[in-house]
């Protein structure tokens, strides 16, 4: 593909040792050479670095620089690329960029370098999204997941599914179009059914395991619930190790939901401390209680706090019922006091004495199936778009199974199989994708 040569600052603006300006395109080397005093860049080898100066229009020195040259196709974009390391001040970096643009080079749009890498075949769409995930990662495991995708572990998994679906389509099409072909396998429903079923089993396994990688990438919506004054806010503060929520002996002091984030052994929890659920005494508290119910409904993990020093109350029983079908950990707080609670808890802690918190953290990872992670656990899908497309492919394969059950013609199967194949291709970006690229790459920073 032929594109205009583009440039942008690739490092954050600010005072630093250096800033880097990236230039990519057919004229990258020749245009930069026009304003560079040093070696003739048109004659240097790829992957070399050169000292010199960027010159003003009148020939005076604008800045002392180091220039890295990457000749196509051995660059990130598969185009000629020049990276100019300038001094790291805001003004000087902007001035050097302006000087580059004066040569006729265009200012890059956000994400345009990564977009070119995709369009030129350097990376697929999954890898492009992985670059953004690395930039925005909030924990070490999220970086591991993104690096797996960047190194094609995810792409290979989807390619394998695509290949199996395509083989099935091809064999069915041969039966339809060339029934006289002696070597063609006769694709009866008895032969098609188990192969589609195997594909569905494989997809279901990927979706199940992808829930864990999605937790790692995006964090886990975790709601702390309990009746008033059982220690919810104290638990939040203990996990955060800071006074984030209001802690008081007065029932109902947390009148709204409070959000905070904590990194727990490579997994980010979005902690939501809710208002205690009871019969609210005023309008403001009622709003907080209503939001608590909504938070429970939307939560991926519920930390239900009970008071070990008191017997089970009506409010406790209501919360146990309200959360029984959720991913839930029942926590007994105030283990430093005599216990009167009649039911078993998963974990016993004392937020006052800071006891049992490490046990709780281990229980959280175990409940989310994020304990004892091994290298292959980071291979699965974590991106919402990928998971949605895989679910759509699954739906199409289920339509094939349904068509078989209703004894429909074999050519009907090919239609749904083709849809499944297209949905898998959309994950990688090698099928039709409309405005997806513009939307996706616009989320990148300029120098990417």
Curated annotation (Swiss-Prot):
Which sites bind (6S)-5-formyl-5,6,7,8-tetrahydrofolate? 22, 83, 122, 448
Instruction: Spell out the CDD domains in the cross-references.
Output: trmE, TrmE_N
| Listed EC numbers | 3.6.-.-
Q: Which PROSITE patterns match?
A: G_TRME (PS51709)
Record-level GO cellular component terms: cytosol
Subcellular location, record wording: Cytoplasm
Q: Name one GO biological process term.
A: tRNA methylation
Q: What is its main location?
A: cytoplasm
Chain residues that bind Mg(2+)? 233, 254
Q: How is the cofactor bound?
A: Binds 1 potassium ion per subunit.
For activity, the cofactor(s) needed are: K(+)
* Positions bound to K(+): 229, 248, 250, 253
List UniProt keywords, sorted A-Z: Cytoplasm, GTP-binding, Hydrolase, Magnesium, Metal-binding, Nucleotide-binding, Potassium, tRNA processing
Q: Which residues bind GTP?
A: 229-234, 248-254, 273-276
GO MF assignments: GTP binding; GTPase activity; metal ion binding
- Residue ranges of domain TrmE-type G in the record: 219-369
State the oligomer form and interacting partners.
Answer: Homodimer. Heterotetramer of two MnmE and two MnmG subunits.
Task: Describe its function.
Answer: Exhibits a very high intrinsic GTPase hydrolysis rate. Involved in the addition of a carboxymethylaminomethyl (cmnm) group at the wobble position (U34) of certain tRNAs, forming tRNA-cmnm(5)s(2)U34.
Q: Which NCBIfam families match?
A: mnmE_trmE_thdF, small_GTP
Instruction: Please give the family membership noted in the entry.
Output: Belongs to the TRAFAC class TrmE-Era-EngA-EngB-Septin-like GTPase superfamily. TrmE GTPase family.
UniProt-recorded name of the protein:
tRNA modification GTPase MnmE
């Amino acid at each position: 593909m032929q594109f205009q040569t583009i440039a942008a600052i690739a490092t954050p603006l600010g005072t630093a040792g250096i800033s880097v300006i990236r230039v990519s395109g057919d004229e990258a080397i020749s245009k930069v050479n026009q304003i560079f005093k040093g070696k003739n860049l048109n004659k240097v080898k790829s992957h070399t670095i050169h000292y010199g100066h960027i010159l003003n229009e009148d020939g005076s020195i604008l800045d002392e620089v180091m220039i890295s040259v990457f000749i196509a196709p051995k660059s990130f974009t598969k185009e000629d690329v020049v990276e100019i390391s300038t001094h790291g001040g805001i003004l000087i970096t902007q001035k050097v960029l302006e000087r580059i643009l004066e040569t006729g080079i265009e200012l890059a749009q956000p994400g345009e370098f990564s977009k070119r890498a995709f369009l030129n075949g350097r990376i697929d769409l999954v890898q492009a999204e992985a670059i953004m995930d690395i930039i925005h990662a909030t924990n070490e495991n999220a970086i591991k997941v993104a690096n797996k995708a960047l190194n094609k572990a995810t792409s290979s998994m989807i390619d394998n599914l695509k290949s199996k679906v395509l083989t099935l389509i091809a064999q069915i099409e041969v039966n339809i179009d060339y029934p006289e072909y002696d070597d063609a396998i006769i694709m009866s429903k008895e032969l098609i059914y188990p192969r589609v079923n195997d594909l569905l089993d494989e997809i279901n396994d990927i979706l199940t395991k992808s829930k864990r990688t999605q937790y790692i990438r995006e964090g886990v919506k975790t709601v702390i619930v309990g009746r008033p004054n059982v220690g919810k806010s104290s638990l939040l503060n203990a996990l955060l190790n800071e006074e984030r929520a209001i802690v008081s002996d007065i029932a109902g002091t947390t009148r709204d939901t409070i959000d905070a984030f904590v990194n727990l052994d490579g997994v980010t929890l979005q902690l939501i401390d809710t208002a205690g659920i009871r019969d609210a005494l005023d309008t403001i508290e009622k709003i907080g209680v209503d939001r608590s119910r909504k938070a429970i409904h939307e939560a991926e993990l519920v930390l239900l706090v009970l008071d070990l020093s008191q017997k089970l109350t009506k409010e406790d029983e209501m919360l146990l019922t309200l959360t029984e079908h959720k991913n839930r950990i029942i926590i007994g707080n105030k283990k430093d006091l005599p216990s009167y609670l009649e039911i078993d808890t998963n974990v016993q802690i004392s937020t006052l004495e800071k006891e049992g918190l490490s046990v709780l953290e281990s229980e959280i990872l175990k409940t989310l199936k994020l304990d004892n992670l091994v290298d292959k656990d980071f291979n699965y899908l974590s991106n919402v778009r990928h998971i949605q497309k895989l679910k759509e492919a699954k739906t199409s394969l289920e339509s094939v199974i349904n068509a078989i059950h209703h004894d429909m013609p074999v050519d009907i199967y090919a239609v749904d199989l083709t849809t499944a194949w297209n949905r898998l291709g959309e994950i990688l970006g090698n099928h039709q994708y409309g405005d997806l690229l513009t939307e996706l790459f616009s989320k990148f920073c300029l120098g990417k």
